[in-house]
Amino acid sequence: MTSLVVPGLDTLRQWLDDLGMSFFECDNCQALHLPHMQNFDGVFDAKIDLIDNTILFSAMAEVRPSAVLPLAADLSAINASSLTVKAFLDMQDDNLPKLVVCQSLSVMQGVTYEQFAWFVRQSEEQISMVILEANAHQLLLPTDDEGQNNVTENYFLH
């Protein structure tokens, strides 16, 4: 039987390595950033953080300023559609608004590697679905590649 572990950041690093997931740590926070999540259209940043014995998997996407009101109106439906994934808007004066989608796992009583692996996979899947749906409704800012394609398309249309 696998024993329960109350993981620290070192344990999370090892488990992510065991899962074959690349990550990096920045100088601004102690979170483990997941660059592969940026492959999903719209994802600006994704990370796993350990806060007060809770693992927090979160992803951020930049929101079109004109889409803040429609997205804010949809947040209740987004949050009601999942028991575990929660979304909110992060709006600060000096930055573009961001959609933050997160999922948490309490590890106060311990967690196994298998439970962590399942949590990470489920979080990736559910969080990416929320962001992909927001992107499909054109609520998010396009990535650099998408923005260049749209400029070209608009040029040919006019």
UniProtKB/Swiss-Prot annotation:
Q: Which InterPro entries match?
A: Put_sensory_transdc_reg_YbjN (IPR019660)
What are the recorded Gene Ontology BP terms?
negative regulation of bacterial-type flagellum assembly; negative regulation of bacterial-type flagellum-dependent cell motility; negative regulation of cell growth; negative regulation of single-species biofilm formation on inanimate substrate; pilus assembly; response to ionizing radiation
One Pfam family this sequence matches: YbjN
Protein name as catalogued:
Uncharacterized protein YbjN
